[in-house]
Amino acid sequence: MTYEEILALSPYQVPQMKKQVLLARELMRLTRHHRGHCQAYDRMLTAIGFTEREAENPEDIPFLPVRLFKEMELRSIPSKDIFKTMTSSGTSGQNVSKIYLDRATASYQQKTLVRIVSDMTGSARLPMILIDCPSVVQNRAMFSARGAGILGFSIFGRKKMYALNDNMELQLDSLREFIAAHRGEKILLFGFTFMIWQHFYRALAASKEKLDLSTAVLIHGGGWKRLTQEAVSPEQFNSALKEVCGISHISNYYGMVEQTGCICMECEKGHLHVSTYSDVIVRRGLDFSVAPVGEKGILEVVSLLPESYPGHALLTEDEGALLGVDDCPCGRKGKYFKVFGRIQHAELRGCSDTYAAKI
């Protein structure tokens, strides 16, 4: 089955039992592919004695700690085929992950993102406010996770404006004009959680001005660590934004540069959902066995997308719990889950959190 054929499947209407069969087959195909094209990956699997006979289910596929992409060059393409290099967010002194993409994988990332996000926003492109500054996307050959997020989500915008200038100052006059020009239309806002709080919400609150974004949709992600430290819960975040601009349709997402494209969107009930093209496995920290619904553990993310690098099964540094399977009240099939935050002593990784650490 080609990835184009997989993308033709509905992002949220494949029941988990059927999806398990697809995942097991395609993850094993990717494992064989990367063993044949990435010597370091093959050596790791040889070292643990992995054989195909052991892999009956998705959870049987060996995972790589996501941190390995900071320490090693892991790619399954020759250097001449590198189309784009993605880098993770990182504070000063931290190593960053480098993810090597060929043209096909980069294209699949964008197509996958469109399939997932369009389920939430609709298929029409919308007037769009990017809550960031223009300079973040200037170097398109060496993208940070922040720049990739901005550029990736920009595809959903018909007319776009940046809410901040390069000094990270809110452009209130431009915002007023943009909102007035699109009065009565649905507007899409996108940004990273801490930057929205620091440079959009706080600036609006200080100005005492209330913008009318009551028909808008806000998508945000990138880490909650700094806001948690400031005792701002997701509920308080949503409530505060509604107070200053009337927005009530707010959706968080969970994702990482190591699996760009396969993000997990928050539904109307406040649950993070994995799509048909990826999955989440919760593992116990003691022995990495699979935890049942409701039990906290370390999140593993799997994706059918990565062809140019061995990132199809990754153990994250995040703690979470599975909330249910195929039975979310929103009607979407598959697993839905909650993220509690970083494992203690893990590095800052999210775009929001690493940006917050620099200011």
Language model regions located:
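Active-site diphosphate/adenylate-binding microenvironment
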Residues: 17, 21, 36-87, 95-102, ...
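Short, conserved beta-strand segments within well-ordered enzyme catalytic domains
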Residues: 87, 129, 188-190
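A short, flexible beta-alpha/helix-coil linker loop
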Residues: 94, 135, 223-226
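Helix N-cap/coil-helix junction residues
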Residues: 50, 122-123, 209, 247
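Internal, well-ordered alpha/beta segment that forms a basic, Gly-enriched binding/recognition surface
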Residues: 92, 109-166
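"Short basic amphipathic alpha-helical interaction patches in structured regions
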Residues: 98-107, 143-146, 204
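Ser/Thr-glycine-rich phosphate-binding loops at phosphate-binding pockets of nucleotides
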Residues: 85-95, 193, 256-259
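Active-site glycine/GP-rich loop and adjacent strand/helix microenvironment
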Residues: 1-14, 18-33, 140-141, 150-359
